[in-house]
Amino acid sequence: MQIKFILIFIVAFISVAATSAQDSVFNRVVTVERDYQPEIQQASKLPVTPNFIKEEVEPNSVVYSTYSIPLVVDFNLHPLQAAKTDFTPQTPLNGILEGGIGHRNSHLLFGYQIASAKHTALNLYASHDAYWGRDALSQSLLGMQLVHHFRNMDMYFDVQGNNDYFTYYGKYFDGNQGLAINIGEPVEHQNLWQVSANMGLKSTHKGDVQYSFQVGYKAFIAPQYTVENQILTHFDINWTSNKKHVAGINIDVQNMLYNTLKPDSTILNRHALRIEPFYEYKHKSIRLHAGVNVDLNIGTGTLLSSVENIAFAPSPNIEFEWNMMDNIFHLYANAKGSIGIRSVEEYLGYNRYLNINQGVAFNDIRAYTPVDAQVGFKIRPIKTMLIDIYGGYAYHIGACHMEAILQDNSPSVQEYKLWLHNEQQWKVGAQLHYHYKDIIDVNLAGNYYFYPLGRIPSMDPTSPNFLKATTTFDRPQWDAYARIDAHIDSKWSIYSENQFVGGRWAYVAKSQQRLKPIISLNIGGQYSINKWLNVYLQLNNYLNRKNDIFYGYQSQGCHFLLGVKYKF
């Protein structure tokens, strides 16, 4: 009976994948069984950079009682990134409906468990966030997921669709001189679509051998430009000995196939294989993961390979943790690397306002990071406080940088072009997390960056001219983050969230232009009417700052959102 169910499941997946598309998050299981506690959410604040779904493992939440996993530390805080709604899978409630509206923005969130049996669950979810006006931005998502639990494994299938709509509203901004031109409505706009489907299985038995397998399809669609098809396959297996020693292998295959709507465009289909053999040692106070990523890309590039259109490069995947003083002092270090395939999705994820034609023909595969390492220690001076201090170094071959193009001496930003540059980056930073009796939560973070300088190549690859840079471009020199949540009583809760980013420069018409610091101050509050109904109010960017996100593109000003959250 179990084999029969598996065969039916596979046939259903193939028929769907041939006509639709999918999300490619490995081992991702979404559920709508959630605990909707009165928490403050940043539902209305749209991100200023596209937030496409990628193949990555979500970081675990900080747990003060165990405190055994290093905090995930990004190389910079993402400016004005929207906070996502968080859920805890505990409550038997079947769904949630959340909506809000402001003077220039709207928000909608829906999740419902259509069917639930002892071993099977079917979930439906959707969301929509929009900001209106000449700097319009709309992001929508609709998805479905099916999970079935067998005796010794779980099987899942999900399908999802995304849409991003935005306008090209860029204007020149020069320090305190204000906006120069183009005060009317922009005439250019763009829709980006993504559809995806995944099917996978994961072992759940208590034996020494564990495995998982997933195959997925994803289509990224830029109308009138191209359709980027990706087939993603993942397999891993590991064997545990004596509960301390683990040996295994991870295998990932990525195939990218293009359909272009412009016959004069030259696009190379690309294929990537990654194999990571690894060894893990687990002890009460020590954890070690030692692996080597062996990457082979076919389509373009050379790197360590002498064969045309084939790129080969190894990189480390090492993680080390040492609980030195019974969860009071923790030392950790890691060193990772990768080689990636350039994609139109990744290209527009860097900056949605880039020239799409250039991205379609962006065949360079040199997205190679030989090493991205950091070392740090965590201190817990009291039970409810965690301090994390760290330093890091990264070296990127083919890091992306932009140039803003000004045509006919016009101060209006006509377009951006992307070029590649090898980049080194050093950083030091710290994070602090504190909570008091589930009443006060404090999260603070700050980073400082240093970039050893090189020579910046001309946009014209045939030109012998070089620009000697005095700084790196599109990167912050420092950033900071502060958030405080206060649960006043069982009904009321308030929060304050603040982000700061500074020391950024833009490359404009082969010259250097300083960007304004990003200062984003946000507050909000929520009132729980009863177990099922909450009302919330948010005020974002209440200083009404027009922060420079990119040269010529500024963030949204002050806006509010009044919303209702209903659980059923």
Regions found by a protein language model. Name each.
Residues 97-98, 287, 291-568:
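Exposed, low-structure sequence patches enriched in small/polar residues
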Residues 1-24, 329, 484, 558, ...:
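Bacterial Sec-dependent N-terminal signal peptides
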Residues 77-81, 87-142, 153:
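Outer-membrane beta-barrel translocator/receptor signature
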Residues 131-143, 156-210, 214-230:
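Flexible loop and strand-edge segments within Gram-negative outer membrane beta-barrel domains
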Residues 111-131, 250-253, 268-302, 438-439, ...:
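Surface-exposed extracellular loop regions of Gram-negative outer-membrane beta-barrel proteins
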Residues 189-200, 214-287:
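Outer-membrane beta-barrel transmembrane domain signature of Gram-negative proteins
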Residues 19-87:
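N-terminal periplasmic/intermembrane-space "pro-region" immediately following the signal or transit peptide
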Residues 89, 102-104, 134-138, 185-193, ...:
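Short sequence motifs at beta-strands and strand-loop junctions characteristic
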